[in-house]
Amino acid sequence: TLARVMAGLLPASQGQVLLDGDELQPALQKRKRSELQKIQFVFQMADTALNPRQRIDHILGRPLGFYLGLKGKEKRRRILELLEMVELPQDFAGRYPEELSGGQKQRVNLARALAAAPEVLLCDEVISALDSIVGANVIELLKRLRKQTGVSFVFISHDLSTVASFADEIV
């Protein structure tokens, strides 16, 4: 519920959402593009979060165009950088989601969120659908990305040991 309120998907029953001291509009539809860019969601089920009819380069390119205004070669370069950031080969840009494993899809889901250059990533049970080895690898990737990008994470999980291994603070 907290993540959905932060993202503007649900209204808060009371209070307000502040980011860097500025109040965010409660409803997603009323947020400005700059507000939308600041908070990105990484959903639990990458299968349903990725459009099966679009190639990975299109999925990653859409937020690059929408939020950052990138086009052409600059957009292509950034798509390849994003794939590298989430430790996927560059040739994945030409693939469709159905050609990827669950862990690879979740990495694409993460890359799509990072494409917006957000301040906060809302990670809702991002490893619960993955086996333990793949999930552990994704957690290590998230730790590296946090150091590399400086993005803050709201990490939601029912597995407290996973949360403890990742979090600076647990609420």
Protein language model features and the residues they cover:
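Helix-to-loop junction immediately C-terminal to a conserved catalytic motif
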Residues: 7
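ABC ATPase NBD coupling module
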Residues: 24-40, 58, 66
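Conserved ABC ATPase "signature" region
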Residues: 73-91
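Conserved ABC ATPase signature
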Residues: 96-100, 104
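Conserved catalytic motifs of ABC-family nucleotide-binding domains
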Residues: 117
